[in-house]
């Protein structure tokens, strides 16, 4: 089964995503900020990463995405941005940073699961 990293500064979001995704049999790792997301991604090499954009002090989700895509050890890990940043310019920044998919909050559990399943089926 897949291992997923959820990076969001808000505990309720991480909990909701963890509960939703664990019903699929996936192992869920968590990070509360960009720095922790980079550390966990490099150490654990998850199958897929879910990244918020605004995660408090430190690198934001766009920066984390760019950094991971530039790292030979993590460049092939698919990244889904999960964020309230819904403008077309934000989406363009996310995809330019290397995101595989871009979902805006609020998102539905089935939308999230279907998105992840689709990406994992291609890897």
Short names for language-model regions:
Residues 25-32, 40:
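Short hydrophobic/Thr-rich beta-strand motif most characteristic of the beta2 strand and flanking loop
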Residues 59, 63, 86-103, 114:
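Alpha4 helix (beta4-alpha4-beta5 surface) of REC/receiver domains from two-component response regulators
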Residues 39, 62-75:
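Short amphipathic alpha-helix used as the core "switch/output" element in two-component signaling
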Residues 107-116:
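C-terminal output helix
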Residues 15-23:
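Charged docking surfaces used in two-component/phosphorelay signaling
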Residues 44-50, 55:
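Active-site beta3 strand of CheY-like receiver
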Residues 45-47, 73-78:
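His-Asp phosphorelay/catalytic-motif detector in bacterial-type signaling
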